Amino acid sequence: MNEIDYKFVHKDFRINGFPIDRNRLIILAVAYVKDGLPYRKSVGRFLLDWLDDRDYVEATTSGSTGIPKQIKLKKQSMVNSALATGDYLKLSPKNRALLCLPADFIAGKMMIIRSIILGLHLDIIRPSSMPLSLTSKNYDFCAMIPLQASKSLVDLPRVKKVILGGASIDGELEAKLQTISTEVYSSYGMTETISHIAMRKVNHTEVHQNTYKALPNVTFTQDERHCLVIDAPLVADHPVVTNDIVNLISRTEFEWLGRFDNIINSGGFKVFPESVERKIKKYIKGDYFITKEADEELGQRAVL
């Protein structure tokens, strides 16, 4: 991975079609903060944080590793994350990218940093459940949540590569994604790891893939709970202990089973609600969920 300083702005970087260097980026950030549109304000505030003299930005965790809290993310680590994504997805300077997520959260922030560091041509639009309805352009790369993808299936082929994160992809959406030309990836990560550190290819595979593969310079282990422990020295100073129970295939590959917080211990047999819900989805129409209730003999039992 190339060593690139966090003050670097790629010569090919564009925002909404305009060439942007560091000085212009400051001017744009101030203009966005003064703008009346909330999504532009959040972009502007983040850019000002990125361009200040500190070597870190502050962010709020999602709760993947515990109670949500404010943490400091090193700017150099964010650059390293951007380079790893570019390497994994083979993104190139002048590739067209779309920001359709709020810049308040790590996924939106990192779309901006990837564009600055990799020299992408970034379009910024208002976050919406149907983002591609707000633009007629074609793109090489975009990050979405599954809800946005599910409401954009007709237009999604206008994007070559899409990463989905922030929530799991249900079986119905995954089946529909098999028929489109877009390369779709399910991403795994959190604020503490500066967005994703592993990917699962959702479509265009010979056989269905249910395992996540590590990005460059990332390895995995498990703790005594069988929860994933992430060692990603280029983006996190210390190993990140998650509450996600996994089947560890190797030091660079795992299958996600469910959250430790949600385990149902029924007579010593551990039930993972998320896994059960995925398996019965094709048999049940409508909304449902698996939960637990007390049982005199089993201790707990799973309830639909």
Identify the residue ranges that each predicted region occupies.
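Conserved ATP-binding loop and adjacent catalytic segment of the adenylate-forming AMP-binding
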Residues: 183-225, 235-239
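Conserved S/T- and glycine-rich ATP-binding loop of Class I adenylate-forming
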Residues: 61-64, 97, 112, 142, ...
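Gly/Ser/Thr-rich phosphate-binding loop
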Residues: 152-205
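Conserved pre-ATP/AMP-binding loop-to-beta segment of ANL
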Residues: 41-60, 93-94
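Conserved AMP-binding A3 loop
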Residues: 55-80, 90-92
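AMP-binding/adenylate-forming
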Residues: 74-80, 96-151
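AMP-binding/adenylate-forming catalytic core of the ANL superfamily
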Residues: 243-304
